[in-house]
């Protein structure tokens, strides 16, 4: 990490036992950061998109490495459909339409890249910057501490397709592994900034590891309720909060990292870690575990 000239803050959370196999570190030839991460994403050229993703995906769909995809507007995966993304696939987000990918409750994403062939979500602009597009939202049916069993995320989305929450802590929204999310966090008119990755009511069967968020104008990783296991996450030069947990989440996070820079941090409340139970007391049911 000494190669970076800017001010860095390293945030490490580790979980281990004396009988467990030792985890890879972040230095040297065995670093878990090797190959799949990218600390200069604005220098990368992924070419032009030749396929368009738009509207509502209601049947099982596969994205192929041989194509470059343009994500246009709010793209919903719904109707219990499975969106499978091959390793090495690049998805360019259309900055003009505030592109956002929403995996609705009951639907699934299988985005399982490889250490040598990660999946990349990034801006379609030639000169990329934080907040170029929305982000990725996973909605599940695991519990939260809110009143009732169902809530909806804001961000100017379709209310019917943006609900989350339920009673199934063991629910499975799919896999995000060896995935990079770059230049997300677009500002909305009424609800602040998108998060690069929002997990709302996501259950513990969902696999979430080796995910890198770079240059997000909002929060990098935000978790509403649910019961998720997070490992080997990277937040790089996020403007707001790197890791935010809210609404009674029962999350576990280990071996993860935040790299901050004072020149791209928000003066309104930028921090590495935020763990709260609610935004306002009237939102939550204090009798709930979550």
Feature annotation, model-predicted:
Residues 1-25:
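Bacterial Sec-dependent N-terminal signal peptides
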Residues 21-290:
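Beta-strand/loop edge motif enriched in small/polar residues
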